[in-house]
Regions:
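Phosphate-binding/switch region of NTP-binding enzymes
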Residues: 130, 135-202
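Short acidic active-site motifs
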Residues: 8, 82-86, 152
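A conditional alpha-helix N-cap/helix-loop micro-motif detector
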Residues: 2, 31, 80, 119-120
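Conserved P-loop
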Residues: 15-89
Length: 202
């Protein structure tokens, strides 16, 4: 069972296998949030695949959090084509969830190439087809810092079932706000050496 260790948030995100996008500025805690899902989820005979498209720093954090279960598979994608290949390869496992951190990084890196948009759409279509088979898709997304707008928003807004924003407050507390579906309530948390600590845990 997928979990964030916050039952209120779990009820919103994981009532059924969905396509979820988590966005926020660099350093807001997107990767920590995704790794926290691994830490909190209770799975036995199924597997979660975690694919990073950025630097391998997440590996150190995963080790620090004790995420060494045989039910977790970690990989790094070097291009959008490589990401497609890794997603397809993950089907050899009994997968219940695919996490991509982040879904639009390689799209931004390759944006000047003619085929970049097509490959990005191909990735979303592939993930959509897997979601229809009952696999949860959870992704982070980078934003354009000066505008706080998701890169590839025109695609991701249509594709995603649920979109959440992570914001950093002046006191370093983070808050989660549900953008899609629109829910006004915000859920605060802090990041510690042991993972995410919910300030008002339910």
């Amino acid at each position: 069972m997928l979990s964030t260790c916050n039952s209120q948030l779990d009820g919103i995100l994981f009532s059924k296998p969905s396509k979820i996008v988590v966005y926020g500025i660099a350093g807001s805690g997107k990767t920590n949030f995704l790794l926290n899902i691994l830490k909190c989820s209770k799975i036995s005979n199924e597997n979660i695949v975690y694919i990073s498209t950025e630097d391998p720093v997440f590996i150190n954090r995963a080790i620090e959090l004790g995420l060494e279960s045989s039910n977790f598979y970690f990989a790094s994608a070097l291009s959008q084509e490589h990401l497609i290949s890794l997603i397809l390869d993950s089907m050899q496992f009994n997968v219940i969830t695919i996490i991509v951190d982040s879904i639009n990084h390689l799209y931004r890196v390759e944006s000047e190439k003619d085929y970049a948009s097509k490959l990005f759409v191909d990735i979303l279509v592939l993930l959509d087809s897997l979601n229809k088979k009952g696999i949860a898709i959870i992704t982070s997304a980078q934003v354009k810092l000066e505008e706080n707008i998701i890169a590839g928003y025109e695609y991701l807004n249509i594709w995603a079932d649920k979109i959440i924003e992570i914001k950093v407050l002046p006191n370093k507390t983070r808050t989660i706000r549900i953008i899609k579906p629109a829910i006004s309530h915000e859920i605060p948390f802090v990041i510690t050496s042991k993972g995410i600590e919910w300030l008002y845990k339910t």
